[in-house]
Amino acid sequence: MLFNIIKTTMAYLESMPKKDRKKIGQFFTSANTAQYMASLFKIPNKEHITILDPGTGTGILSAALVERVLKYNENIFVELTCYEVDENVLPVLQENLHHMKSVYDDRLDIILKQEDYILSQADDFNHDIFEDREAKKWDIVISNPPYMKIEKKHPASMAMSKVVHGSPNLYFLFMSMALFNLRPDGEM
């Protein structure tokens, strides 16, 4: 499965100039790194595992982790949530997620959210402690978020002003939000 996703990712990389990807902080994870990162997780001993990949890109990290979890654990069901906003990469991601679903059909549920991950979680992140609301939490977060500095007036910086000190970096904000979205016994 991962081989097919690597192929579509390589085709995308060849079609999209590096300077354009660099402008939006888009640097894709290599196949070897994705497999290595997936190997680091201790898979929870439960029947239903939730995985979050904020800023999914082409889905290579998700694919490596899902393959690791489901290939050797026949009694596990995975719910994978992917966030991606880049209109150029979305068709590639959708194709890759469709391929993943075709391989692991009844053991994998995929939720693709075409929205800004940080802004979508901002209300939960900033909620008043007296409000009765429960933020969505995941068992595992795997991510290679965009890497770039942003201004303090950027919507993501303003949404997470509690953790913005000095020059904000989108990578840091993604990781801070992912930590917020992690179950207490979860892994990042």
PLM region spans:
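SAM-dependent methyltransferase catalytic region
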Residues: 1-188
